[in-house]
Design a protein with these regions (language model features):
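Small-residue-enriched hydrophobic alpha-helices in membranes
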Residues: 1-64, 68-239
């Protein structure tokens, strides 16, 4: 916005050369006004430390959902954070969580509200994908964990077909590929191809450019699952 105002002022003073100069100067001030430590996409902005601590808080809700803290689930979260942020940063996140946040009661609606207000829909899809990974770390997702995941998805205002699509990646049954592509089992090849294009666009990692690296990795995994589901259904239809 600043660059355009500056361009107009420049034009009124020096005509076309002034417009160019005003645009450049305005763009420079816009750059200075951006907080470089924020994760940004369109009109959404969230500080990395806020994102990471809230993500860890949601992780804790899943780990404690069935009343039993599984070591594999703890290791999954720790390995994930170390892999995405490095050991030093991950240790700092865990320290802050343990000393400042863990002792407090975590309210689901407060946590999800942060993500609704400060992240894109695509980012929230990847958060859900990550949480499913935690629940499945011990090789099984309990009904209680599924219920908690459903509550989180609802709290983050995710569509039911999107929830079912991600769920199908972890809870296996015969029509998983259809659920991943969010189509009916009676779909023909044209329906499958159309659904694939839609899902590939929705989950393409490029849509999360500039977002937290952990969410980009989740998008890449989901994108691969969409491709696998599409290929499986096309093979099935051709047989």
């Amino acid at each position: 916005m600043i660059k355009w105002v500056a361009a107009i002022i420049g034009y009124s003073m020096l005509r076309f050369p002034g417009a160019i100069l005003g645009f450049v100067i305005g763009r420079f001030f816009e750059f200075l006004s951006q907080d470089s430590i924020r994760i940004r996409t369109s009109s959404y902005s969230i500080k990395p430390e806020i994102f990471q601590l809230n993500l860890l808080s949601l992780s804790a809700l899943i780990i404690k959902a069935d009343g039993v803290v599984q070591q594999k689930e703890l290791e999954f979260v720790r390995s994930f954070f170390i892999g995405q942020y490095g050991k030093e940063r991950a240790d700092s996140i865990f320290r802050t969580f343990n000393t400042q946040i863990k002792k407090e009661t975590q309210h689901l609606d407060q946590l999800t509200r942060v993500f609704i207000q400060q992240t894109t829909y695509e980012t929230r899809l990847q958060i859900l994908h990550f949480l499913f990974g935690i629940a499945n770390a011990d090789g099984h997702i309990s009904d209680v964990e599924l219920q908690k995941l459903s509550q989180i998805a609802s709290g983050m205002r995710l569509r039911l077909p999107d929830f079912e699509s991600i769920k199908a990646m972890f809870v296996k049954n015969t029509d998983n590929a259809y659920k991943i592509l969010e189509i009916d089992s009676n779909a023909n090849q044209d329906d499958i191809k159309k659904a694939y294009r839609k899902m590939a666009k929705k989950y393409h990692p490029d849509k999360l450019r500039g977002q937290d690296p952990a969410m980009i990795k989740g998008a890449e995994e989901k994108f691969r699952e969409v491709q696998k589901a599409y290929e499986a259904l096309i093979r099935q239809k051709n047989n």
